[in-house]
Structures are given as structure tokens and as C-alpha cells.
Amino acid sequence: MRLLWGLIWASSFFTLSLQKPRLLLFSPSVVHLGVPLSVGVQLQDVPRGQVVKGSVFLRNPSRNNVPCSPKVDFTLSSERDFALLSLQVPLKDAKSCGLHQLLRGPEVQLVAHSPWLKDSLSRTTNIQGINLLFSSRRGHLFLQTDQPIYNPGQRVRYRVFALDQKMRPSTDTITVMVENSHGLRVRKKEVYMPSSIFQDDFVIPDISEPGTWKISARFSDGLESNSSTQFEVKKYVLPNFEVKITPGKPYILTVPGHLDEMQLDIQARYIYGKPVQGVAYVRFGLLDEDGKKTFFRGLESQTKLVNGQSHISLSKAEFQDALEKLNMGITDLQGLRLYVAAAIIESPGGEMEEAELTSWYFVSSPFSLDLSKTKRHLVPGAPFLLQALVREMSGSPASGIPVKVSATVSSPGSVPEVQDIQQNTDGSGQVSIPIIIPQTISELQLSVSAGSPHPAIARLTVAAPPSGGPGFLSIERPDSRPPRVGDTLNLNLRAVGSGATFSHYYYMILSRGQIVFMNREPKRTLTSVSVFVDHHLAPSFYFVAFYYHGDHPVANSLRVDVQAGACEGKLELSVDGAKQYRNGESVKLHLETDSLALVALGALDTALYAAGSKSHKPLNMGKVFEAMNSYDLGCGPGGGDSALQVFQAAGLAFSDGDQWTLSRKRLSCPKEKTTRKKRNVNFQKAINEKLGQYASPTAKRCCQDGVTRLPMMRSCEQRAARVQQPDCREPFLSCCQFAESLRKKSRDKGQAGLQRALEILQEEDLIDEDDIPVRSFFPENWLWRVETVDRFQILTLWLPDSLTTWEIHGLSLSKTKGLCVATPVQLRVFREFHLHLRLPMSVRRFEQLELRPVLYNYLDKNLTVSVHVSPVEGLCLAGGGGLAQQVLVPAGSARPVAFSVVPTAATAVSLKVVARGSFEFPVGDAVSKVLQIEKEGAIHREELVYELNPLDHRGRTLEIPGNSDPNMIPDGDFNSYVRVTASDPLDTLGSEGALSPGGVASLLRLPRGCGEQTMIYLAPTLAASRYLDKTEQWSTLPPETKDHAVDLIQKGYMRIQQFRKADGSYAAWLSRGSSTWLTAFVLKVLSLAQEQVGGSPEKLQETSNWLLSQQQADGSFQDLSPVIHRSMQGGLVGNDETVALTAFVTIALHHGLAVFQDEGAEPLKQRVEASISKASSFLGEKASAGLLGAHAAAITAYALTLTKAPADLRGVAHNNLMAMAQETGDNLYWGSVTGSQSNAVSPTPAPRNPSDPMPQAPALWIETTAYALLHLLLHEGKAEMADQAAAWLTRQGSFQGGFRSTQDTVIALDALSAYWIASHTTEERGLNVTLSSTGRNGFKSHALQLNNRQIRGLEEELQFSLGSKINVKVGGNSKGTLKVLRTYNVLDMKNTTCQDLQIEVTVKGHVEYTMEANEDYEDYEYDELPAKDDPDAPLQPVTPLQLFEGRRNRRRREAPKVVEEQESRVHYTVCIWRNGKVGLSGMAIADVTLLSGFHALRADLEKLTSLSDRYVSHFETEGPHVLLYFDSVPTSRECVGFEAVQEVPVGLVQPASATLYDYYNPERRCSVFYGAPSKSRLLATLCSAEVCQCAEGKCPRQRRALERGLQDEDGYRMKFACYYPRVEYGFQVKVLREDSRAAFRLFETKITQVLHFTKDVKAAANQMRNFLVRASCRLRLEPGKEYLIMGLDGATYDLEGHPQYLLDSNSWIEEMPSERLCRSTRQRAACAQLNDFLQEYGTQGCQV
């Protein structure tokens, strides 16, 4: 052996003497665009005195003659034999050398150029190079949002911070993009960042589905410099308290015989930190690797919270029993998790919050063992360092844990040697164990175990490097602990095994992808190197050392992690010393930095963390260091079997002319291949077995849908008949029937009670109400601002009114110190005594509302407080308001207190509840919230449009009649609103029309939930922008209008992307098949919007490509999932629909050609052009046949003209269209034609008088005429026929903008904008209009002077009494438009609207099957409550447990109060059907206004839309409205159901309205009223005597026949009639019948004698008159009896045109005595007095 080593030493010495000079070239293996590249050059083995000069630069490997960077010179010598250079990589040079055009991969070549290479080394060239990976990634971008979670429709505010590679502010241009939860880009913005901080915001579309959205940013010239942040979108309400589940141990051991009792603690605390009083409902289950839950039956528990906490124990026996029911044992649980769900119901207010624990693992050891920091390479003859990290299952480091190592060393020809070592972990859970390694080693096998008696075990095998090499380099680290910034790290270098005689070690330090330091150290017996660790080396670095032995480099490396806890600079946030604050107080926020910096602040309610997912965390320094470390090019802990491997693993590229590292292929490190064994646990439970019978995911989902219950009664056969896919129907039906057989028929319901303080006492020694601040401002976040701070600044902040914990975040950006994220500061805002108040969304006049504020007392003493509701006009309150209730609130508890309130005015009132303590205990709180009060009945709208033409003498005077709808509620005080304009283009497309704050969408009064409807946000705005651009009229509108237009277009683009599918197509709903028609519509509009939305042309090219796949052989297009059924469009059914669709797609494809700008898309563009030509031939053929209806003829003519089809085809289409034109006056339009099968409209209106209102046409006529106008403009320009068609279209616009529905509005505005561009003139014209009317308040007159270029005073909105006629006089030389809008509430609707459609809504009290309907199929498996005869059944079965899992998706706090839960829930049934002879456009919408105080259960609505047997296409909830979308209305009655919960008690609930209408023809509708269940407490009286008396103050008082005492007052009837209130009518009537009308009772009577009249000139004996009284009044007139009624004239009329009378406090109602009664001696005088009054008043009236 000695001889062998001697020979090796001799040969090495001989080799050393032959070492040749060489140039070494080092660089990071990746070049980042625009970032300086560190390059190391070194001379090796050159003769003494040698000087070498040269330069380094980058070049394109394929284009050697053009450099990609400037050249950097170097000079090396034998004394100064190395240099570290910096090479700039400018963007302009990278482009000029063609790097961006490389096809084979993004590589760039680093080149060293020196004549010495050729002259002294006899090389063939003076170039030495190495290939590097080229990346456009550079710098750092950090993003921040103002909240982690948002509701759909909420505004997102965000910031982007830009830094360069050295973490200093960057001012480059960035591109920001927003992606929705489907991964589709919905927003793109390019911005310049002069301050390095960019702030912006956007609104999430209200139709967005729940999911995770992403905002990403990149430097605009660096496509790979992408950074992003995520946030959650879902419907939520901020929780009032948070629930946490904490297991006793973070793991559950599954070792046989060692299963312990499972302990867990449940904690519930209000967001402001105080404990919750209430009850906890807990259930358990299993979670598998895929997250699927299986619930344990029988382990449910109910416990009371004590001081906000509850302790739960699950015994070994209970758990094993539950496992046995699943046919499982303890050993089957390895790798699974125990799932725990807890629902807490707060006692005082009945609010519910939930939490779940999903990280409680079943494990074989309580520890985990991590060997990732141990090298995978060893140095023979040098110690091998084993580095292990031991963690507890919670993830925290495990200190003091024994780690045992068994190291087996294998050497050739000898017996393996085993070393056993034991060492305890340090405070950070780590151990570093050196293992002695002999020089002859071939393999090292390590077996490591941590902990006892159930250790975590890991194994590692390390092979020795190949023998026969040039020796080895060992890097030894005396102190293995991670250094901190500012420490000095000592490393020892040793050459092992070669006997090499070199003079120096060379070493480099690499951090964040750059060589930051290069040096050499003379060789000694033990060479020590000291490394000072500064901020540039954080959070980790590689130390790489090497030497040369002969012609071979010998190298090793070591990765060093740095404890980089703080940022380079400094940012500290602090507040004044108080631990607790009160709302409305000022707080001084201290900002401290160590340099001039911009500090970005934000404060958010920590309740948001409880509302959302825990995964969306705010930006912190950990994320910053993670981003910095992402530039680290090294992979692994260091080392390698060869020098080239060492360099590559450290992220270095190397070349010495003879050998070099291979070019890197990707930025990231290769991932270790890990395999996970899928567990196949057989639960053998009924439902799981059933699911297991189906292999395909589709069949499984259908089966799962089948076992899920609906919130309404349906047999499985009925449900299966609705499933559209045949292959889904069988598993759905089978699983539905199977689940039905498993369900139990009854469940127990538990109730709990609350106490109320009802005693009303007078105010005594109370503190002044003015001293109590009113709380009314409750934001979710605030303080979103950026401050400039020079080392120190104090901000004075005023705290909002929320009682919560605020978290203030700060982030600083300094030119000298870079980015720093401060530790957040928490501010707890709290009042020891406070109240909490909930209000319903809205109530109606004279309904009775029970307010139930909850008083919280966290003081250590009992409090007696006085609580009252402040007086406010429009509300009836006890004592007129201000009368207080005195309530005792014990220390540390809460008490609810009830107030009855009756609203009497239809308005929004600010309702303030005040609680006051005494001077002895001066506590108090006041909360103000707005209560929305609406009128009775349902809103009805009607519009009139008049053309103003002073040039036609017949139209210079108009008379607009007043409205006298017999259904109008009697005391609504309604008005007619008049709007006059002299500029139709600016009126329709300006800042009050298409560019109004909500766009046309907000003006249509239609829902916008489906894919087609949402385009109303985008298309009209584009038409308006196009008109204003072309006519240069932006300046006539408010300055911000154009910015607003761009914002509207961006919002529309974001909305429509919610409906895009991966193949580029669009669907009305994502769950439906793609629609050809909708996809074409989107393509057309987005092609026109490309510039504004910054959308991807490639995405629209995909859309065009999908449309081509829908074209048939004859050139037509098919639509397998139509959005609208257009069979009603006129002409031949079916044929017309195909023709219209083909024309529509052809138009879209033509507009879509604009996105084919790049050369690569040319083949697809040619295919599109060929498709258009083929479709045009089809259309021409159909037009030539002459059988098309008006709509198909119009769109065909336009398509052929737009695409420049052959002239003969265009001519035929034009002639066909003009043959169908219809005239009315000077207007031209296209509607129904003779022989049309359309049932949509009435016959053509006859020519009219100019002073008559313009007949309002249906949506289809408007759309047809718009297409005709578009055709005429292309065919003949602005000519007479185009003028006439445009004039007709203009007069069809609604009062507030838009037309009837979405499609007609989009096409009409498109056509009118094109016409107005063509007809624009700068000539000024004037219009003079005088309006006059005599109304309730006398004569009223307005004179208007308008011109056609005005914007100020462009639209004058005037109000006139609804029943009064309006006289109009017109003058001037300009045409204009006058529109009248009448809005009023009606008593009844069905008689006038329900011709073709029918809707019926019924509400019932809670029924048994609806309870079960809220459960998943999992509940049926394992969670059925024990039956009554079960001996183990709990004494009080728990209702919330039955609701638990089924409501996981409902909005928070949807749980009703525990008190009287059954009574506060109702079941809605909505039934729709239609007349079988009537055709519909397809989509219909049921708009159900819920009864006051109710909201629908979202989980129920989701079941109607999300299962395979879909009943409703989509649903929306807006305030008290539930909108249900139906694809069609059946001819037979079809019903759907859902539950609703009343959060706030309301009594005397009035009927609410429901409307069913055809979306695309809204005039076709049915509106009805429905009421609360009969004998329901919803109809009971809630008010106290005094409040009831106030509410009835406006009610009439019935005078009983010959009331006692009144006869003593002479002439009391005459005084009422003639003095106060002085009546306007007096009748003696006989009551015939009573009828209910909305919130009123109607009495139909026959006049028997007329005593007096004012307005009712036709009143006579035997005529009929109607009298109305509010349903909330107690007055009842008995049919068959006669009454004397006197009062004031009414404002409404019956169907015959006769006045109707409202009976109120100004009415006299007296029952007429019978003849028998008058004959009695006692009443004779009184009867005579009554007859004398009737005689005198009837003949002489009032003598005053």
C-alpha cells in the first residue's frame, strides 16, 4: 500500500512539473437582462513576470459578429492573477444582437478575448468562451393588497413596489395584470413608476364565482420578471367573533397499544379580544390525502363555553367504536387526518361562527426528520458532516431530542465498519454530527432516528467519488450554526489524498445569483478563511473553493444559510403605550426609519383573517427574503464528485479552455423525484360503496349529485328526468334512490331561550346623551396611504367605530437601504360597555319591527343602564321616542333588550339606539344605522316619448294627459318626471347615458348575470367612445368622462372573462356548453376593444378558430347551446334562426380579422377569410329565395354589405329588406310582417299625429331596425331612409337611457353612433320649450332654452304631479325629444300583466323535509342523529348540528337565532308556467322580493343551480330580491323551492311582489303579490300599546251608531264636516263586499245618498264607489250595513274612472242606526239629531 501511494505521489509531482498555463473564466450560469454580470478571470500556472491583457463580452452564439454587451478590459499578471469584473447587459444591445430571436433556446455566450490565448497557448483562436442561460428576469417586484379577501363587487386596492437586483428602488416601466379565479387575464396595464411605488384599484365583477384571484407584475422589458400576489373572492360578512380549535397534541400516534385520549380546546373570542358566551357544537371525521371527509357517527358533542373556552375529550373506546363502524383499525389511519368542525352559537345575539381543524395527523412518530442540509457527496479521508433538523408535528423545532446515527462505512475488500453516535438537538432543533471517513471508503450508509419511544426514521446513502482522481478538497466548518448578519464565519480548507504542491487556494462567494467576492489564500497545513457576513450575503450564500492539480481543477463548495431576521434598513411602527383604545379616539402612530424613505401604510380589520382562507398572508420580510433567494442559482447543500459538478451545483459556469461546464437548461433546480403511495382505504360504508361502483369522475359526480337532497320535494324519477346527459342519468337515479332508502324520517329539534328586559322605567340620574359618541363608520380597512418619512414622523389617526382589533402594516422603500417590512402593530378598539345592533335590509311602511340591541358589559360590576331609540320623523316609538327601558346587565355578561318600532314614512331614516349609565357609573354607547323604508305595494313604471319638431305646425303644442291608474296606492304622492333634450347623440351617448356612472347597464333595470347580458357593460361604451372620438366632442362632457369610459370598458372586459372557456369559446354559464352566438358576440366587441383593454390577440384568435369549428358544410353555423331561441324572429321558424346566426357570426369574424396582425397568424387569418366567403354564399342563397323574416333579412343585408359580398347578392338582400320597411309619419322601421309567425308584438302602429306619443316598440323591432340602419349607412351613406330609420330608433330610447333589453340596446347604440358620426354637424340650432301644469300645489310653469351642442342644461329633469296634465309649447329651429317617466306603487298587478306568463309564490312555515335538505350526502352516511328510542341519544338533540355541513358555503352569520328558530324560517315555493300558444325568446327571469326582514339561504339556491338535475340556470341576490334565471318557461307548471331566514323580527308583514318576465322582451311579464303564511306570527302584532297607538294615528276611527255623550255636543258632525278638517265629500253608503289589495283593504260600496261632493261630480244614488283603508288599521266595515262616510277627496280612480277614497284620520265613518234602534225611547233624540244633520248638510251644505 505504501508503495502504491509512493507511486501516486511521484506521478503527481511529475504531472505538476508539466502543468501548462491557462486562463480560467468564471461566471454565474444565468445572465439576467439589464443586470450587471459578475465575471471572474484568473491566470493559472503562468511563468513569473507574465502579463496578459484581454477583454470579456457577451455575444449571440449564432451571430458572432454582433456583441450583446459592451466589452470590459482586464489585465492579469503572475502576481495579480485574478480579477472580478462587472459586465453590463443593456436591453438595446440584447435586441441588436438578436437574442430575442433565438429559436433553439435562450442562450448567450460569454467570451474572453486575448491575443495571449493564440500566441502563448498555441490555440487556433484568441477566443475562449462558455455558454450561459439567458433570462429576461431581473429585479424584484413586491405586491400588496389592502385586504386578503373580498366580496364580489368590492373594490380591490393594491400596490406594486419595484426594486432592482441590489434591492434598491427602480423607476422602470412595469406591466400589471389581473387574473380571475379561472386563470384568465381580465386586466392589463403598463405604467411608469417614478416613485418606485405604483398604486391602483379595480372592482371585482359582482358575478364572480368564489375562488382565488391573482395580481401579477413584471418589468415591461423583462417577460420573466414576474411576481404576483393572491387574494380570495367569496361572499362573506365580517364575523363578530373568531373560533379556534387547538389540539392538546399536534399529532395522534397510531402505534398499536399507544392510542391516548384525544384532547382539544375550543376558543371563541370577539374580534376585540373578549370571550364569547354560548354553546359549542362539535363533530369529528376523517380526511384522506385528497381532502375527502368521512364523518364519524355518534361522536357529536354539545358543550357550553366557559369564559369563551370549552375542553373536549375523545376517549380511546369512543374512537375505536366509531372506527369499527367504518370497518377500520388504528393501523389503517397512518397518513390520514382527524377532522374536527366546531360551530359556536353566541347566546345573547344568536350569531353563529364556524371553524375546522384539518391538520391533526395520524402519525407513527411525534417528530419529523429533515436531512436536506446534509451533503450528498463525501471527501475520502475527511470528516463527513451529518446535519439533521428535527421538528415536532406542529412544525416547530424540537429541542433536546436525542438523535441516534448508525453509520456503516464500506471499503473495498474489508468488512463494513459501523459507527453509532448519539447527540441531542440544540434549541433550533438541529444536530451536526461529524463522521470519520477513511480514504478507502466506497459507500456510506446512514440510518438516523430522532426521539423515543416512537422515533422518526430517515436513511441516506452516499457513494464515494470515482477513484484515481487528482485528489480532494475538504471544507470544514468548526461552527455549524447559521451565522447572523454582522458575524464572521470561519472555514478550514484541506487538500486530501493528492499530495498536490500548489501555492494558493482560490475561492469565490456567490449570493443571489452573482459572484460577490473572489480571493485567494496561501496554502498551509490547515488553511483558514474568514468570511464577514453582511446584508449582501443574506439570506444564503455559496462558498466555492478550488485549486489545480496538474491539468485538473479540484473543487468543493458549501451552502451557508444566514439568520437574516431583519431588513437592511429600518422601519419600526409603534403607538402610544395604551393596550386598548376606544372608537373615535385619536392614536399617535410613530414611524421610525434610518434614512429618508417612502412608507406605505394600511390598516385592516383582523376579522378579515377569520372570514377568509389562512393561506393568503400579508407581505412580510420572510416573503421578501424568499424572493431575494429565488435568484440563488445553486442547487443543494454543496459539493460534487468532480470540480465541474461542484461549479454547476453552486450555480457557476466555468471554462479553462480544455473543459467547461454544460450550459444550464432552466432557471430552477431539478426536482427530486418523489412518489406518494395512494392509500386505498375501504370504508365499506353504504354511500362510499355506492360511489365506488363508478369509475369515471363524471359518473361519480352524477352519483354524488343524486344523493344530495334538494330544498324541495321531488321524487328521484322526477329529478333524473331533468339530467341532460344520458350517461349521467343512470348513476344519478340509482344513487338518489339508494340514498332515499337510507334516510330517516324524523329528527329532533332542540331549542334554547333568551331573556328579554321588558320593564319600562322613567329616566333618572343618567349621563347626558350628548356626551356619548355615536358609532356609524365601520370600514373593513383604512389608512391606505404613502408617507415620506425622514427618520422619524408621528401621524395622528382617528380610529373608526368598529369594536375590533386593527392591524397596521407598514412597508418602507429607501434609495440607500431598499425595502423593509415592519412588524405589524395591533390596535385593540374596545368599550367595556357597548351595544350591538342588527337591522333588516328594508321594511315597508306600517310593518312592525322589533329591534333587539344586545348590551355587553365587560366591567367587573353589575350595571343598570337606560336604553332608548332616539326620536326620528317617520318612526313610531314608545313615548314618541326617547322613552327608555332600564336594564340590569350583570358583570361580564350580555343582555338583549327589545323595542317595537313602526315605520310610517317611506324614506331612509337614521335609526339611533342609545344606552346610558348613571353618573355613578358613567358608561354609554350609541349606534346609528340606516333603515330603508319602502312604500306599500309594488313599483310600476311607464314611459312616454314625444318628438319635438317646431318645424311641423301640428307638433308645436302637446298635451300630456295625467295618470289615473286604478291600482295606484291611494296616498303615494307620486310625480311625473319630464326630460327634454335638443341633442339626441349627447343625451344617449354622453355622461348621462352610455357613459353615466354605471353605464347603460345601470340604466336598463335588468339583471346582468349571464355571459350575454354582461356584454352590456362593454359594447355601448365602445359605441359612445367611438362617436365622441370621431366627432371630437369629449370636451363638451365633464373632464373625467373619458377616464370613466376607459374604466367602464375595463370592468366590462373583466366581467366577460368570467365566462371564457379554455378553448376560447364562451358560454352563458360556465357549466353549460359553449354558445356559438355568444362567442361571436364577444369576438366582435373585444376585437373593437383591443386597444382599451389590452387583451391578448392570441386569445381572440383562439376564439375565431373555435367559431370556424362550428361552421357546417353549406356555410351556415350551428349553435348547440343557444343563449336565445330566436324562432320568434319572423319568417320561417328554424330557417330564419340559422340564417340570422350565420349572419351574426359572419359579422363577428369580419371584425375579428383586426386581431390577426402578426405573421404567425396568417394561416388562420386565411381560413377565417375563407369561412366568411363561404358564409356569405349561404346568406346570399337564402336572401335570393325571398322567404326571410324582417330580422333575418336585416342582419343578412348588413352582413353581406359589411363583408363586401358580390354586388348581386347585396342587391337582392337590400331589395328584400326595403320591401319589409314600414312607415309611421316621417319615420321608418322594421317590425312584424304579414305572414310572420312571431307572436311578439301587436300589429303595426298606424301613422300618428305629431302631438301623440311615439308608440313604444318591442325589443325585436328595435334590433331589426338597428341592423337595417347599419346596412343603409354602408349601402348608401347618410340618405333619407337612414335619417328616417335613425329618427324612429332615437325615439325608442327609454327615459334613463338604453332600450328594452341587452341585445336591442347594444345593436341600436352601435347603429345610432355610426349614424350620428356620419351626420355630425357643427351648425348650432336652438329649441325653446315651455311646460305648464296645474297640480296639488297650484300652477307650475318652466321655460327651457336648449341648443344641440349644449352640455350644461342639456337634459332638464322636471317634476309634475302624476295626476295632472302637462301642456307643452315648442319653438325654435332644432328637433328634440321629450320623455316622461311615471313611477308609482300599485295595489294589484296580476289583472293587467299576466296574459301569457304565470308565476305563483307561496310561503309556508318550516317543514320537516326542508331541515334535511340542508345536508350533504356525507351527513346521511354518518351523521344522522339517534332516534328517540336510542338509549344513548342526548337529552336535547341539536338543531345546528343537523345544519352544520350543508351550510358550509352559506354566507357567514346565516344561522338564525337559537330562540324560536323554527318560527323564523320559512319555505318558499316559486312556480312558473306559460300559455302553450305563446313562444318565448328563451331566457326568463323570476324576480322575487322577499318578505321584510328575510334573506334566502344561499346553500339552498346553490343546490338549484349546481347539481346534475339543474332547476335554475343561475341565481343572484340583490338586497331583498332573489333573481332566478330559467332557460325557458314550460307550458306545464314547474316549481322550485328554497328556505329563507328572518334575522330581525317583523310583524304585520305586508305582501311582497314577484315578477316573471321574458328577458329579451321585458314587456311580456307577469307580476303578482304573495303574502306570509296564514296564522303565522309574521302577521301578528309586535308593537306595545303606545307604539301601536302611534302607528294607528293615521288610521280612521269608526264612530259607533249614536255614540254616548256625543249627543250632548251640539252639531259635532257639522263641525267635522265644515270646520275641521272640512270634508270634500259626504256619502251615505251600503257596503257590498271587502277585498284585500296588497297592504290595503278595499270596501266596495253603493251610494244610497249624496250629501256633498267636490271632485266627484258624477256621484249619485246607486252608483258604486270604492273606499280603501290600510291593512294595519283595525277598521272593518261589515257587508250589508250602511255607513255615513265623510272625508277628503282621493288621488286615485277606479276602472270606471270614478274617484277612490282613502279612509284615514281625516275621515268620518259612522254606522247608520237601524229603524228598530231609532224607535227606542233612549235613542229617539239621537236619531233625530242624525237625521237633522243629513237633511241640513245634504240640502244646504256648509254655511261658512
Curated annotation (Swiss-Prot):
Site-annotated residues for Responsible for effective binding to form amide bonds with immune aggregates or protein antigens: 1125
Modifications after synthesis and translation: Prior to secretion, the single-chain precursor is enzymatically cleaved by plasminogen (PLG) to yield non-identical chains alpha, beta and gamma. During activation of the complement systems, the alpha chain is cleaved into C4a and C4b by different proteases depending on the complement pathway: C4b stays linked to the beta and gamma chains, while C4a is released in the plasma. The alpha chain is cleaved by C1S to generate C4a and C4b following activation by the classical complement system. N- and O-glycosylated. O-glycosylated with a core 1 or possibly core 8 glycan.
Pro-peptide positions on chain: 676-679, 1447-1453
Principal location: secreted
Tissue expression summary: Complement component C4 is expressed at highest levels in the liver, at moderate levels in the adrenal cortex, adrenal medulla, thyroid gland, and the kidney, and at lowest levels in the heart, ovary, small intestine, thymus, pancreas and spleen. The extra-hepatic sites of expression may be important for the local protection and inflammatory response.
Record has Phosphoprotein as a keyword: yes
UniProt cross-references to Gene3D superfamilies, sorted A to Z: 1.50.10.20, 2.20.130.20, 2.40.50.120, 2.60.120.1540, 2.60.40.1930, 2.60.40.1940, 6.20.50.160, Alpha-macroglobulin, receptor-binding domain
Pfam family name, one: TED_complement
Domain Anaphylatoxin-like: 702-736
Modified residue annotations for Sulfotyrosine: 1417, 1420, 1422
Domain NTR residues, every copy: 1595-1742
Disulphide bridges: 68-97, 635-669, 702-728, 703-735, 716-736, 1471-1535, 1583-1588, 1595-1673, 1618-1742, 1718-1727
Function text: Precursor of non-enzymatic components of the classical, lectin and GZMK complement pathways, which consist in a cascade of proteins that leads to phagocytosis and breakdown of pathogens and signaling that strengthens the adaptive immune system.
Protein name: Complement C4-B
Source organism: Homo sapiens
Gene coding for it: C4B
